[in-house]
Amino acid sequence: MAARTPVIFLHVGAMKTGTSYLQQLMTDNKQVLLEQGLLFPGKQGWSDQVLAVRDILDLRLDSELRERGTGAWGRLRAEMLAYQGRASLVSMEFLSFASAEKARTVVRSLRGAEVHVILTVRDSSRVIPAQWQENTQNRGTISWPDYVEAILADSDEQSASRQVFQRALNVPRMLEAWGQAVPKERLHVILVPTPTTRPAELWERFASVIGIDPSVCAPPTRPRNASLGYASADLMRRANVQLADVGMLAYGRTMKSYLSKQVLMGREGEPAVATSRALSDFALNWNRSMSDAIAKSGAHVVGDPSDLDVAPSDASEIAPPPEEQVLDAARDAVAGLQKVIGTRTKRLESAHRDAPADVEPPPVAPAVDIERWAAAPDPLDAAVTDVAMLARHAMALRTRLRRAVGEPEGDATFDESRPSSETVGLVGKVMRRVRYL
């Protein structure tokens, strides 16, 4: 009897193309997928895939995770090659940064398996604002108008913003790199549906490629990644200026996981990030280049070409969000931070009562009077300063909690069993410091 050839799918991204939604869905339905013959590997959850990809691509950028990542790809590889089911699947956006050489290295490491590559592609007019919003949640400080200006600039010397854009949206480069690593019949492109389609459409397209009945999987327990409103994202990037010295993981657990995801994304009625005629025209041309590259690659394509259509804009320029809208976001941010500070303070007080010799009592929270903002020379600066001050205090409390009782449950929990904003937040650091691997 002939030996079985393992089948391995590599979902390589790209960034901001529904990857978090798909990863969450597959994490939540891991056992169901296993019953269908598909392994979504990782003994400790999806974070094992993050560490493994960092390992194989040699992304040694964070000292806190470096030791945990050593040998992670070898462990994940062994798990997949030993699996006796129909196929295994890895989904991790860092793979989209790979050069042709690195892509070949990844595929060669899986020698003996039939490797398929999946690339999800989304209309760039929707990706570009999402990129900037993500940037504001990863310590980014550039304003949206300046970000757009940098992307539109026709210059040989690329800005940091333009480089980030290229890494996330240079689909021709991604197809060329991975197209050299696998035969074209094993290269799959899935077009991300437009927002008007059913939420499950992306999963149904993805499931058709990996050979799964989409109806057997329940929707993710966490909602799809919501977007920050324009004012909330602007507040985040302003606060980031004052938090530039904060470590990435400390920042992610309070600013991204909690303030952004749990407080500011819950604000209703906030206007979306603005666009302009120039940006729409740029996105239209960029989408054409992606479509041409997809056709040239010979890849198996799932989706409708109209999914890459661009909604026109008549705006001649992009203006900053109105100051009052940013102040409203700051008021909600203060309320949210005061709430989490209260929760963390109570936990530290309890830990101090249980072990007064080992745990210091929590520090007193800074006082904030939002009524004074209006009387300040620069009300917005006063508001941002208060938000940053409270965020620092919340981070300090969480650091003490970790030392006292280990990883605290509840607010902004770093749950490594599923896609988490801290794990995904590493993308921001990688994209700032790595060109193409």
List the predicted regions and their residue ranges:
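Anion-recognition interface
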Residues: M1-L437
